[in-house]
Regions:
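Cytosolic/matrix-facing juxtamembrane and C-terminal tails of multi-pass cellular membrane proteins
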Residues: 1-14, 171-184, 188, 223-226
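N-terminal first transmembrane alpha-helix
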Residues: 1-86, 91
Length: 226
């Protein structure tokens, strides 16, 4: 994906007021919960413009904050879901631009790289192979999607063809697939340090889940299920 696409994505992410509002609430409340659990701080009272509130049930307050963070996690995900899809396209397109993984020879109309043995079509017949997209459908289900078309008496039907990367044959071996998963992990992992939008989007989840786990452990909720 081009640099222009990345800049456009960051601009949309930064200017989405709904997403940013939910993000601030989730991060703020999660940090508050973590601070309470790590330091043992307690709420004594809260001043409002009308009256003063005193907190006498600290465990009840912890349950309230627990439910609040859980609710905010769900709300944040509903706002961030389509950004996750675009983020996936960003790192996966970077991976497929790696010549060691996939390289299309325009003159020979063929594919080189790690995926050459997994792709059983010729570029002359299927020119859309040069526009392949990485496709994840399960925990270890991977594939390539490329645009193609079918000519019939009613006209031309355009669709995307799937090449399964878990169908081992014709030189495509399990060790090649494991190597591909290694590249996938590398591109996802390095994205967190090289591209700030990854941590911007995923960071609130990390704080929220950490706050939930620590609070559940402090309240002893896990012991009731053991």
């Amino acid at each position: 994906m081009s640099e222009e696409k990345l800049i456009e994505y960051r601009k949309k992410l930064d200017t989405d007021e709904g997403l940013q509002g939910k993000r601030k609430l989730l991060v703020g409340l999660s940090i508050l919960m973590l601070a309470i659990n790590f330091t043992g701080a307690v709420f004594k009272e809260a001043n409002t413009f009308i009256f003063k509130i005193e907190f006498t049930n600290q465990s009840g307050l912890s349950y309230f904050l627990l439910l609040a963070v859980l609710f905010l996690l769900i709300r944040y995900y509903t706002y961030a879901h389509h950004y996750h899809e675009e983020l996936y396209k960003l790192w996966s397109s970077r991976m497929l631009r790696d010549r060691k993984i996939l390289h299309y020879h325009y003159e020979a109309e063929r594919v080189d790289g790690l995926l050459m043995h997994a792709i059983n079509v010729w570029g002359g017949d299927e020119p859309g192979i040069q526009a392949s997209k990485y496709h994840i459908t399960g925990l270890f289900q991977r594939g390539l999607l490329y645009p193609t078309e079918h000519h019939h008496e009613d006209g031309i039907e355009e669709y995307e063809e799937l090449i399964s990367l878990t169908n081992f044959k014709d030189g495509w071996r399990k060790r090649d697939y494991i190597k591909l998963l290694g590249y996938e992990f590398k591109y996802q992992f390095t994205a967190f340090f090289k591209y700030r939008e990854n941590l911007d989007l995923v960071g609130p989840y990390l704080l929220g889940v950490s706050a939930l786990i620590l609070t559940v452990w402090k309240l002893g909720l896990l012991s009731s299920f053991v």
